[in-house]
Amino acid sequence: MTLPDGLLLRGFVDRLDVAPDGALRVVDYKTGAVPREAFEGKALFQMKFYALVLWRTRGVVAAQLKLLYLKDGDALTYAPDEGELLRFERTLIAIWAAIERAVATGDFRPNKTRLCDWCDHQAFCPAWGGTPPPFPVEAAAAAGWPTLPIVEVG
């Protein structure tokens, strides 16, 4: 699906249930445990993405978004509405605009979080004092990618 600004959206839904009245339920299976309440919003980002695509392609707002966590058998469910999907669409467009600005300027600042403690790429990450490998200029040119300037992050 392509948004009005040209952003192409694509994803793979694990399961789409259709009720006799046509109501849709989007289901995604997760191998871990249900997240704490503080992290539910991040967990539902993917599901809102699917709901937006369904709404824009079928004209139907999913009645329910459901994440099923196989580790503990718990589920996280959510019922979006049209207004929220419009806000989410604007959020996606803003995120994409930020990515395009980063590509245009070469400014990809790392976002250091607690998850970084387990990352195998710390030696390459400026947030950890690492040095990224050189950009593969020849491969990028062959693929038609723009060459990006190097921006030091301090």
Language model feature labels by segment:
Residues 1-154:
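RecB-family 4Fe-4S metal-dependent nuclease core
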